[in-house]
């Protein structure tokens, strides 16, 4: 490919409202252009990167025995009603009606469509297992699209669905998909971790996310410093917290006057007691299909509430903040809430089970209770609702955990029979009995991977593409196209590399050398070959984009040298 004939509209200025490197460089480098909020067009080199990622994903999935299909982008609402998700998914699900008033949705995921495809077509255990996937565009009407391709409304996704006769076989496929995903992300040249995760709106029994490690990631991950344990903080566990200080001694359980003191830090200073020995109360309004209620969550003063864990503990669709006025109407005193004598639902963190000698709210303004004993709460709901923090201990090996940021690029789920049972999708087992399919589902954000790769691989000059997915592997930069010797050598080398199977572009534009090298750095081709003034002395330069190191070599060695570098990567 010749640069002079390729549509690569690079820009000098950063796009408006872009804050992340991937958003800035993908727009400036001529990879994508915005059409509307959260919707982007892929230009030639952006489409090329996308296709390379897609090819690696497809190759590994096909190798694992998966079969590719292509499902409709538009899904009838009836299928979502069958699964029970139509009313639960929220405004992110874009609904519309056709001219005949039939209701449809633009599918953000395709569980319903895939179940509908398989039911009545796969009727016997002899036809199982089956793993079908597609790589198609999806739409999710995000409330706040941002960060370019990382949180758009339209996105290219690989979604796969497996069907099994029993749980054991589903878990076998789940493990195979984890291995396959590791192969995919490894081949893409990414630093990533597979982490335990919450099942979220998809549902199921267990799930893992694949996180590209990057400081710009929206997700926080807890990672053990010694073993392989890693989890999204929404699902992360920890070993029981060790007491950080000596427990206070209280002779009685009684109220104590604490005027204008309600925060844990203020109370800790006042009582000279570590926050660990306080009971923190967090009030939330839980929303369900059938209504709403106020729920009080209690945990140690040194911990923070993990809202996803808390919501899962009570089976809520969503949790929102509750106003002081609403609390007061329910007989609850804001800032001084105790787990005692409450009429509404209470949930206590498992670390408080059996705890004694604590300080908690007094259910009365400006009062706290000292000497609280939670060992009396035998029938209360104790469950893990605390957010894992830096320095907590690994639940598997007991080593210290650290927190880091990640970008979710893949997610696998053990779905079980949630969708098949709801949609009456059954097969006949060995005994001739009808049973719902046991399912797994497996997703990869293909277009998100374009951005995630740059979040992990960039510098202040632009993109640094891994060679496997770079728009071109080698950029031949002819410094002065008016120099016949330079252009002739560049043309000859271009043909040699192209014939050898190297993905190469020849920068033959009638531009000065400065803009050409800046575009090389901005776009991020892994290798550049500078054909310049040194050619008269028989040398050219090879520059590696990652390090920007330049090596001058004899012109007769350049073909062999660059070929070895590309083939070794």
From Swiss-Prot:
Consists of three domains: the N-terminal catalytic domain, the editing domain and the C-terminal anticodon-binding domain. CDD domains: ProRS-INS, ProRS_anticodon_short, ProRS_core_prok. This is Proline--tRNA ligase. Homodimer. It is found in: Cytoplasm. The keyword Cytoplasm applies. Catalyzes the attachment of proline to tRNA(Pro) in a two-step reaction: proline is first activated by ATP to form Pro-AMP and then transferred to the acceptor end of tRNA(Pro). As ProRS can inadvertently accommodate and process non-cognate amino acids such as alanine and cysteine, to avoid such errors it has two additional distinct editing activities against alanine. One activity is designated as 'pretransfer' editing and involves the tRNA(Pro)-independent hydrolysis of activated Ala-AMP. Keywords: Aminoacyl-tRNA synthetase, ATP-binding, Cytoplasm, Ligase, Nucleotide-binding, Protein biosynthesis. Belongs to the class-II aminoacyl-tRNA synthetase family. ProS type 1 subfamily. The gene is proS. The keyword Calcium does not apply. It comes from the Bacteria. Its EC number is 6.1.1.15. PROSITE patterns: AA_TRNA_LIGASE_II. HAMAP family: Pro_tRNA_synth_type1. It catalyses: tRNA(Pro) + L-proline + ATP = L-prolyl-tRNA(Pro) + AMP + diphosphate. GO terms for cellular component: cytosol. Gene3D superfamilies: Anticodon-binding domain, Bira Bifunctional Protein, Domain 2. Pfam families: HGTP_anticodon, tRNA-synt_2b, tRNA_edit. GO terms for biological process: prolyl-tRNA aminoacylation. It is an enzyme of class 6 (ligase). GO terms for molecular function: aminoacyl-tRNA deacylase activity; ATP binding; proline-tRNA ligase activity.
């Amino acid at each position: 490919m010749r640069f002079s004939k390729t549509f690569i509209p690079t820009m000098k200025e950063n796009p408006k409202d872009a804050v992340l490197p991937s958003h800035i460089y993908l727009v400036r480098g001529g990879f994508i252009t915005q059409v509307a909020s959260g919707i982007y067009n892929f230009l030639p080199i952006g489409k090329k990167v996308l296709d390379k990622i897609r090819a690696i994903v497809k190759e590994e999935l096909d190798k694992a025995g998966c079969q590719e299909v292509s499902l409709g982008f538009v899904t009838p609402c009836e299928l979502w009603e069958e699964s029970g998700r139509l009313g639960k998914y929220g405004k992110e699900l874009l609904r519309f009606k056709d001219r005949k008033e039939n209701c449809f949705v633009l599918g953000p995921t395709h569980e319903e469509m895939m179940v509908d495809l398989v039911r009545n077509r796969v009727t016997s255990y002899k036809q199982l297992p089956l793993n079908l996937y597609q790589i198609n565009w999806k739409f999710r009407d995000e409330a706040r699209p941002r960060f370019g391709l990382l949180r758009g409304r339209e996105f290219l996704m690989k979604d796969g669905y497996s069907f099994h006769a029993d749980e054991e076989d589903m878990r076998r496929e789940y493990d195979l998909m984890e291995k396959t995903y590791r192969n995919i992300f490894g081949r893409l040249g990414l630093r990533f971790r597979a982490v335990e995760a919450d099942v979220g709106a998809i549902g199921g029994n267990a799930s893992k996310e694949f996180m590209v490690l990057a400081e710009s990631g929206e997700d926080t991950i807890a990672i053990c410093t010694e073993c392989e344990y890693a989890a999204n903080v929404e699902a992360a566990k920890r070993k029981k917290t060790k007491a950080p200080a000596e427990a206070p001694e209280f002779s009685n359980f009684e109220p104590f006057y604490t005027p204008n003191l309600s925060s844990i830090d203020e109370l800790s200073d006042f009582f000279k007691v570590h926050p660990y020995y306080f009971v923190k109360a967090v009030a939330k309004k839980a929303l369900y299909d059938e209504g709403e209620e106020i729920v009080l969550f209690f945990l140690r003063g040194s911990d923070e509430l993990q809202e996803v864990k808390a919501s899962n503990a009570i089976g809520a669709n969503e949790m929102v903040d509750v106003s002081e006025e609403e609390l007061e109407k329910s007989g609850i005193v804001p800032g001084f809430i105790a787990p005692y004598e409450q009429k509404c639902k209470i949930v206590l963190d498992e670390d408080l089970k059996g705890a004694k000698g604590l300080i908690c709210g007094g259910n009365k303004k400006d009062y706290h209770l000292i000497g609280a004993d939670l060992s009396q709460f035998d029938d209360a709901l104790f469950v893990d609702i605390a957010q894992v923090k830096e320095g907590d201990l690994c639940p598997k090996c007991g080593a210290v955990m650290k927190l880091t940021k990640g970008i979710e690029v893949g997610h696998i789920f053990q779905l079980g029979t949630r969708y098949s049972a709801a949609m009456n999708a059954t097969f006949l087992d060995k005994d001739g009995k009808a049973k719902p399919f046991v399912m797994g589902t497996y997703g990869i954000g293909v277009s998100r991977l374009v951005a995630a790769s740059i979040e992990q691989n960039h510098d202040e000059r632009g993109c640094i593409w891994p060679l496997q997915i770079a728009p071109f592997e080698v950029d031949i930069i002819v410094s002065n196209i008016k120099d016949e010797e330079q252009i002739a050598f560049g043309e000859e080398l271009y043909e040699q590399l192209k014939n050898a199977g190297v993905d190469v572009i020849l920068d033959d534009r009638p531009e000065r050398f400065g803009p050409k090298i800046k575009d090389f750095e901005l776009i991020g081709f892994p290798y550049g070959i500078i054909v310049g003034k040194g050619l008269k002395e028989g040398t050219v330069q090879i520059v590696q984009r990652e390090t920007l190191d330049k090596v001058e070599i004899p012109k007769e060695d350049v073909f062999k040298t660059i070929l070895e570098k590309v083939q070794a990567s």
